[in-house]
Amino acid sequence: MKPGSTESFHGQELEFYLAEGNMNTRITHRTAAVAIAGLVGSVTLALQPALAATQLTGAGSTFVYPFFSKAFYTYSQQHSDVTVNYQSIGSGGGIQQFTAKTVDFGASDVPMNADELKRAGAPVVQVPVALGGEAITYNLPVSIPGGLRLTREVVADIFLGKISRWNDAALEKLNPRAQLPNLPIVTVHRSDGSGTTYIFTDFLSNVSKEWKDKVGTGKSVQWPGSNTVGGKGNEGVAGQVRQTSGAIGYVELAYAIENKMSTAQLENKSGKWLFCTESTVKTAAATKPNVSATDFSIVDRSGDNAYPISGYTWAFVYESPTDKVRGKMVKDVLSWVTGDDAQKIAGSLNYVPLPPSVQETAKKALAEVKV
């Protein structure tokens, strides 16, 4: 992908249909799996079941949804006895459903913390399953040669509400060739509990002491500023940015590409200007080859080609599932998802295949599941 450009998933389409007021995704052999912008509510992946197949259920991260949907469809084609229904409801919702024991597995862009693990009521195994980056997307009525440039500090000041108009001197200094409009900045954030938000606010807390002290890091935070709106899921944020002139928001890269959104160049910790791409996210991950459920952040890493808003998605299962048959099926699915074949699918959807060291971490974690 060229810097600043947008691409679609070649030859892959989504078909949507409405059923009793809910938006569901029907998977065909050409389905990619990205929820398009502007869709509100949970997006549920329903793999058409084979005869007598066992349907597993999962819920959580919208960040990982494009990858999960195609990966689970592919798995079901290879294993006719299993289908997977994955509900893209946000990391916070996924953790809630998992701890309520209404799903077989959950997924979040930040591992479960001590309080959440306590609510689970039994030992939990957390497994890194995907690696990706978050693009800063914007909607302006003017073309910006080479794409909008933002320093780390300016991103924080925009979301703090300190920079409130697009022709602010700080933005004009960074983008001297652009005719930035005298237009209010509308910041767009997640309205639901979100691992995508955790990664983004972790980045902001690393680059701005004011953000860290006033707002902090979390799946859900009190967003400062008077001109800010929320969207449910990555697809909701993408939709709000697309329909609001002067808007700026953060979404997982696959959503920005599928929706042909403008993305900003960010100045990283080493002073280099970078777009969110597979290459720049891969470099960020390479600076920390060993991650765990208690040491996982890869935001704002040093390195000329290290994109500063990068992160992993984690799946979680019970260490000793009550239903050993279903537990074995979930373990097998996640083993396949973290393996080479599925990670090639991730790469085709603008994620970054898990580094070998992280694949080994996933393998060791899944070995702890007793089925």
Task: Please give the residue ranges for each predicted region.
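Flexible loop/hinge segments at secondary-structure junctions
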Residues: 51-371
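Small side chains
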Residues: 38-41, 58
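C-terminal segment of classical bacterial N-terminal signal peptides
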Residues: 40-50
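Bacterial N-terminal signal peptides that target proteins for export
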Residues: 24-36
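Short, Lys/Arg-enriched N-terminal segments with co-localized hydrophobic residues
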Residues: 4-22
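Short, flexible coil/linker elements and helix-boundary hinge sites characteristic
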Residues: 19-20, 35, 48
